Curated annotation (Swiss-Prot):
It holds the Pfam family ADK. Its cofactor is Mg(2+). This is Adenylate kinase. Optimum pH is 7.5. The gene is AK. One of its GO terms (molecular function) is adenylate kinase activity. Signal peptide: none annotated. One of its GO terms (cellular component) is mitochondrion.
């Protein structure tokens, strides 16, 4: 069975998780993967990877592409759903390359980029911080996260376009339902229903 890799990109606070959950509900044969959720599950379950990742994060370091890519590859190998929705992954060109190696000749790949101005992303992150309890949901940390995001994102978009992958931009200024209607329009373009 041919798989579909649906890659959802967008800055922190863009609503990727919300839209990925909507997609998973809408497409019966889909699975939603968030690398953050995978990492938290590994840490919670105190697996070998989880203990390693917990130590890396505690020391303020970034989890390596190797660890992230291995976790994603394991998820893909074990998953039998037709559509895999990637929430904010890949984040870097090296991760994109690793993901493309997992694709077969029959795999359809579609990239959706949720575009929203930085000022609104920062407002959303700070607003979310009031209820999330996340220490990095404040104005200063949000600005730093956005700077890192833009540095990686711009290179990713260049690589996606260079590989001629189907790429769609969705203006994410509307409400969640309005945005999801735009995403459903993308589905029609790539043969998903």
């Amino acid at each position: 069975m041919a798989k579909v890799f649906l890659i959802m990109l967008g800055g922190p606070g863009a609503g990727k998780g919300t839209q990925c959950a909507n997609i998973e509900k809408h497409l019966n044969s889909s699975a939603h993967i968030s690398t953050g959720d995978l990492l938290r599950a590994e840490i919670k379950n105190k697996t070998e990877i989880g203990l390693k990742v917990e130590d890396i994060i505690r020391n303020g370091q970034l989890v390596s592409d190797e660890i992230i890519c291995n976790m994603v590859n394991n998820f893909i190998a074990k998953n039998e759903k037709e559509v895999i929705v990637f929430d904010g992954y890949p984040r870097a060109v090296s991760q994109l390359e690793a993901l493309l190696k997992e694709a077969t000749a029959e795999t359809k790949i579609c990239v959706i980029n949720l575009e929203i101005p930085d000022e609104i992303l920062i407002q959303r992150i700070v607003s979310r911080g009031k209820t999330s309890g996340r220490a990095d949901d404040n104005t200063e940390a949000a600005a730093k996260r956005l700077a890192v995001y833009h540095a990686q994102h711009d290179e990713m978009i260049k690589a996606i376009k260079a590989k001629n992958l189907p790429y769609f931009v969705v203006d994410h200024l509307g409400g969640p339902d309005e945005v999801f209607n735009e995403i459903k329009g993308v589905f029609a373009n790539v043969g998903l229903h």
